[in-house]
């Protein structure tokens, strides 16, 4: 996992980034979750090798967080639902986290670029941020010019 974000989440405003430890703001009774957001897949074998593997790695690396997942593709969620597998979208997953008593949430997308999916995710989070004491969104893999230069 290439994100040092999970416990050292980026809180940004006006284009500046400030590293702060989300866990340091937890008080007695607070609960922290890491919501992994994926586009999704309808292929069970692919899901096991990719999405499930990423979620498992997050569980291993960040045991202080409850790891949850959400999918962004409505088409994939609908196809999975027809087969009896329900996947929550980000707004549903955030509402469920609130219902389950979580107070601090980091949302990390597995999107590669900062495109339409990330913009939609930002809107979901903005509309629900009042539900939590703290909620943060991690950057996609390729976010800064430096990120692109590293893979060029």
PLM segments and residue spans:
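Extended amphipathic ligand-handling, pore-lining, and cofactor/metal-binding catalytic surfaces
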Residues: 4-152
């Amino acid at each position: 996992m290439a994100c040092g974000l999970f416990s050292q989440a980026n809180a940004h405003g006006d284009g500046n980034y400030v590293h702060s430890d989300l866990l340091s703001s937890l008080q007695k009774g607070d609960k922290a979750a890491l919501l992994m957001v994926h586009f999704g897949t309808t292929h069970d074998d692919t899901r096991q090798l990719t999405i499930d593997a990423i979620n498992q790695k997050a569980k291993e690396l960040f045991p202080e967080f409850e790891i949850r997942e959400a999918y962004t593709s409505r088409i994939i969620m609908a196809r999975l639902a027809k087969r009896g597998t329900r996947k929550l979208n980000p707004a549903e997953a955030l509402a469920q986290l609130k219902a389950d008593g979580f107070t601090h949430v980091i949302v990390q997308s597995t999107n590669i670029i900062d495109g339409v999916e990330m913009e939609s995710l930002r809107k979901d989070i903005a509309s629900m941020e009042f539900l939590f004491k703290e909620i943060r969104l991690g950057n996609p893999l390729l976010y800064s010019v430096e990120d692109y230069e590293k893979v060029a």
